[in-house]
């Protein structure tokens, strides 16, 4: 029986995880399509570029990875202690490199004064974003969604590019 990833990933047990993402509809992630002769090798660079970008934002280290013709493998280290050491401002600066943030976070970073109610919601948002910065699911979501959108645009199609959300296995299980 399958388990939700939030139940599979326990940073108290291990911080290292092996994540796998597979393509659907016989889509090529990279390599050459034997039937059409079309090369998708440039997509490997998409993955490497996005990995470099998000590795600077998230508190997750990429220990190893492999990009195959229709799937990827990543060995990730989730560093929640690093995320907890970040200042509130550092958390928001990192988060805003990938996402727009909220009105409260934008005002805070702009140096605007926040009333007590806004400060209350800002504190909740910072706590949530801090947790996400060491969350493997969020890391894989950002990576896979970016690649899927580019590949779907290139392939002139819509819908899922990856079969399921990425699967995370502890290194013991892998």
Regions found by a protein language model. Name each.
Residues 1-174:
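Short catalytic/metal-binding and nucleic-acid-binding patches
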């Amino acid at each position: 029986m399958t388990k939700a990833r939030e139940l599979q990933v326990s940073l108290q047990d291990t911080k290292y995880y092996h994540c796998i993402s597979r393509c659907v509809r016989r889509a090529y992630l990279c390599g050459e399509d034997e039937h059409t002769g079309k090369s998708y090798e440039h997509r490997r660079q998409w993955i490497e570029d996005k990995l470099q970008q998000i590795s600077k934002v998230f508190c997750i280290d990429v220990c190893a990875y492999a990009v195959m013709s229709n799937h990827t493998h990543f060995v990730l280290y989730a560093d929640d202690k690093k995320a907890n050491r970040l200042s509130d401002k550092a958390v928001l600066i990192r988060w805003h490199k990938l996402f727009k943030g909220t009105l409260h976070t934008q005002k805070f970073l702009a140096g605007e004064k926040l009333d007590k109610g806004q400060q209350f919601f800002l504190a909740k948002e910072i706590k949530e974003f801090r947790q996400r910065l060491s969350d493997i699911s969020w890391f894989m979501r950002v990576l896979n969604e970016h690649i899927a959108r580019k590949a779907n645009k290139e392939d002139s199609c819509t819908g899922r590019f990856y079969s399921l959300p990425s699967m995370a296995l502890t290194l013991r299980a892998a």
